[in-house]
Amino acid sequence: MAALTRALPAPLHTSTTEYEEAPAPLPTTPGPQLPKYGQRKGWKPKTAADFNGGGAYPECHVAQYPLDMGKKNKGQGSTLALQVDQDGLVRYDAIAQHGRAPGSRVQSSFKDLVPLANRTDVTESERQMERPDDLSVAETAERTRLALERITHGKIKAAQPKHVPKTNSDATYIRYTPANQSADEGKQRIIKMTEVQEDPLEPPRFKHKKIPRGPAEPPPPVLQSPPRAATAQDQKDWMIPPCISNWKNNKGYTIPLDKRLAADGRGLQDVHINDNFAKFSESLYIADRHIREEVRARAQLQQLLAQKQKTSKEEELRLLAQRAREDRSGLSSSVSGSVAAASASRLPAETGINLGGYGSESGSEEESDEEEEDEEAIRERNIVREEKRREREKEMRMSNMGSEMRAKMLAKEANRDISEKIALGLAKPSASKETLLDSRLFNREALSTGFASEDSYNLYDKPLFAGSSAAAAIYRPAGSSRNDESFGGGTEEGIKEEMSKDRFQLGNATRGFEGAEGVEAREGPVQFEKDTIVALDGSADPFGVEQFMDAARRGGKRTAEDRDEERRKRARDE
């Protein structure tokens, strides 16, 4: 190896191993700060950088399009970009040129109305409107012809039916040589083959039957627990109540209340009562108790103040009465002063101390009598005040009542029945025992319990209301005098008289009942006669038993009277 190295010439260029340096990292712009999982409440990803190359965030309930997947591309809008001309003015004619074919010219300015000969911005070559050459005319004509043919062929193809099968109507000639070489040599024949014409309206010759579906694959085996019977609790949990409407009941069935409530679904959820209701009720109770205690204390204080005021007023009245008595008795002013001082010190009168040595027992008795009279007068005044207060309260209630209620109260007070009359200022007469007994009933025989003997049958022997006056009073319609006058006094004669005065004869019947023309006028009630049936032996037969038995004995023999009766019944039925 060393000899080989010496034999080789020296290298012209020395090779040095160069190590490529690692490229410096390019400065990257920091991306958006994405919130961590669990802290994305209220955050909405809007740009593609928010997804960080991944998918959507399921915890953010907004429309998300990662990598623009599912995002609908917006079509070309109709909004025009603002354009200006070489002078910096806005080109409003861009609106008129929008949507036109390229190359079309729209006259949208005033200079388009000026003739070309008078315009300064048009060159001489543009003014000279040269005719097109023959080549351009031919090209335009060919382009127009092709466009018209395209439109025409499109309409023709639309009218022609599609998918029409092509029929090969050409005949086919076949040279046929029989294979059997019999005694008589077979001759070659030429056969002409053509397609048979088919009737397009011929029904199908063969019926296509659908192959029945094969058996399904057996289900895969699934390991499951053996079936077990449902318990009563399971049946109750799985029970679905029938649907019962709260508005319709066309059949009119009577549905129990528990079934109606079961269909409402109220028992499916447990009712949880908030504890704040109890706290609220307790606070209300405590507040009510405090308020009642305050009201009670305030009432006691007011009562105590009223009692003190009443005591002071009574003391003042007592002093005034005592001073008046002293003035009437003619005592001196010094004595009155001492009496006032003694009364101010509230010394009782029972101590026996006389007023200045001038008092006596007779004077104390007079004072006690006057005090009793004053108390009686005060009591009477209090009673009068209470009555007046009640009257004022009643008047106040009457004023607050409605008109209807006030009228009822007034009518009730006006129609009150006062059964006792009191003569004021007179002594009450004492009721004597003689007025309590009726002397007309003395020495009279009492009636029996049944008012008659048990074997007598004379209860209806006499009319109930004997006399025309009683009957007229009973059968007269009740009413005011005005009604009596309008209906002829309520009597039959008055009614007939009023009907006879009828101008249009509306109240008179043109035809009455048969057999009632000769009946005389009747006063009072209708009087009936007792129908007594007499038997053959002359005894009374009230129920017709003897007559019935007699007809039964005769049997089927009918008399002429029976035939007449039957004939009358038939005529009446017909």
From Swiss-Prot:
Skewed-composition ranges (Acidic residues): 363-377
Subcellular localization, as worded in the UniProt entry: Nucleus
GO cellular component entries: spliceosomal complex
Listed Pfam families: SKIP_SNW
Biased composition (Basic and acidic residues): 378-397, 493-503, 558-574
Biased composition (Pro residues): 24-33, 215-224
Keywords on record: mRNA processing, mRNA splicing, Nucleus, Spliceosome
GO BP: mRNA splicing, via spliceosome
Region (Disordered): 1-46, 203-234, 350-406, 478-503, 549-574
Assembly, per entry: Associated with the spliceosome.
Homology family: Belongs to the SNW family.
Name of this protein: Pre-mRNA-processing protein 45
Lineage: Eukaryota, Fungi, Dikarya, Basidiomycota, Agaricomycotina
